[in-house]
Design a protein with these regions (language model features):
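Fold-independent oxyanion-binding glycine-rich loops
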Residues: 20-21, 52-53, 82-85, 106-109, ...
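Anionic-ligand anchoring segments at beta-strand to alpha-helix junctions in alpha/beta enzyme folds, i.e.
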Residues: 12-75
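Hydrophobic/aromatic residues located in beta-strands of well-ordered beta-sheets
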Residues: 47-49, 103, 149
Length: 169
């Protein structure tokens, strides 16, 4: 799988990271996984995660306390939408998508409307975290990134029991 995300990050100075309304484990795992990964590999990129408030049971994820819950007037070079099948799922944070200079959506839902400038939709993936993992340079996946990605995997696979679980998962 080509690393479209990495190519879109070239020359970018700011990234808004969005997920869906009522964030679950895959949404939080993918958004915070990407946030922490960017901090590892691209320390010069200013990244922020924007999501509705999430359950405290996910507070163990690094970056959970840094999630922004209200929109502001910032404009970003790139908006990365994760686990969101259409713009409506971005809720009140769709303003970042609309104002961004470029956009990409990574998702695993077959119903994805491919609304971003670039879209990587892998319908047979177990989770968006699995899709995201395929886009990342393993050398920059530390424990915090891995914990985020694992959270998404176990959430969307029912701890590897659901039929969406595969050998690749």
């Amino acid at each position: 799988m080509s690393r479209i995300l990495e190519s879109m990050l070239d020359g970018v100075k700011s990234v808004a990271i969005l997920g869906h309304i009522r964030p679950d484990g895959d949404c939080l795992g993918s958004t915070l996984g990407l946030y922490n990964y960017l901090g590892n590999k691209y320390p010069g990129i200013h990244a922020r995660v924007y999501l509705e408030e999430a359950a405290e049971k996910f507070a163990y994820l690094k970056g959970f306390d840094e999630i922004r819950h209200e929109p502001d007037d910032r404009v970003y070079d790139l908006c990365v939408c994760l686990d969101s099948g259409d713009m409506g799922r971005l809720g009140k944070f769709s303003c970042y998508f609309e104002r961004a200079r470029d956009s990409i959506c990574l998702d695993h839902h077959v119903t994805n409307t491919r609304y971003a400038s670039a879209n990587l939709v892998v319908a047979d993936a177990s989770s968006t975290c699995e899709v995201l993992y395929g886009q990342l340079d393993e050398a920059y996946i530390d424990r915090t990134v891995a914990e985020c990605l694992y959270t998404g995997l176990i959430h969307d696979t029912g701890v590897f029991k659901y039929s969406c679980t595969s050998a690749k998962t």
